[in-house]
Amino acid sequence: MKTLLYAGSLKLVEKSGVGQAIYHQQQALESVGIPVTMDPKEDFDAVHINTIFPNSFLMSKRCRRKGKKIVYYAHSTKEDFRNSFRGSNLLAPLFKWWIKRCYRTADILITPTDYSKKLLQDYGISKTIYALSNGIDLQNYKRSVPAGCRFREAYGFSPEDKVILSVGHYMNRKGIVDFVELAKGLPQYQFIWFGYTPPSARTADVNKAVKTQLPNLHFPGLATQEELKAAYSGSDLFLFLTHEETEGIVLLEALAMKAQTLIRDIPIYKDWFQDGINTYKAAAIEEFQNRIQEILEGKLPSTVEEGYKTVAQRDIPIIGEKLKEIYQKLELL
């Protein structure tokens, strides 16, 4: 058998978490001996669809007519569409209608977490839904002191500087406005955010935030995977201020790199992460300010090793075995 990883409009998502997820699926399937193709002209038995663009919807319908098994990855929800791009809140009800239409073309749905599975079930989608992480390639994420030093040199940070890192699109949902407020309130620390969203797609508050000029605030734009790994290695704290996620691949990356993490206390992470055990959590700005200072001044113990144990359960070979079990239930193997 062979699986098609449908990559229609890949250029639009390849630098996002969805782009990473497609690559991880290829690794996971190949780790258990399931051949993969990216070419829809080749013969295949099953298709993985990861996006909700019109061409993805049409490909799913086409594959159904040809008797192919359709595995639709439900990365998107109405909840994580809101507070993202300009006009997203107005369009959220229409977006929900559209993704339901896309997802209903599948034989099964795979979504990264039990939290996102519950959201989809609440939409009234009756398809079988599996909660399966996008996974992380632990072999590819190793903390490197030399790489961390190169990161600090590249951005002019001294060995004594305390550096706080975040990664994501420029959008309110990702917490970028709060990131800027924290930089204002904690001038003794360096704040750096990797990622980008075109100005035309940003909301007014986000545009205002990223134009803020502070000596300790840095927005260098997009970074390669190697540059991100250097940043994870060279920073003192990974700060994940997101308000809504279906998983959060950059958080998995930070944990795999054994970075100290501080995340927002939101429902998706309620059972997955325990405050003070495998990460630290906060909610309000004042609480984040206090936690950041306690962590960076050494007043709180490290959660790095427990965080690594948590993410190790999502290593690519483990995800591959679970995908294989799903394929067996679909009678593909």
Residue ranges of predicted features:
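Short alpha-helical donor nucleotide-sugar binding micro-motif in glycosyltransferases
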Residues: 103, 222, 230-235
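Conserved acidic donor-binding segment of nucleotide-sugar-dependent glycosyltransferases
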Residues: 273-286, 293-300
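Glycosyltransferase donor-sugar binding loop
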Residues: 6, 167, 189-205
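Membrane-proximal helix-turn-helix segments that form the acceptor-binding/catalytic region
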Residues: 91-109
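Aromatic "clamp/platform" in nucleotide-sugar-dependent glycosyltransferases that forms part
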Residues: 243
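Conserved donor-binding/catalytic core segment of Leloir-type glycosyltransferases
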Residues: 157-174, 180-184, 192
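Short hydrophobic beta-strand element within catalytic cores of glycosyltransferases
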Residues: 260-263
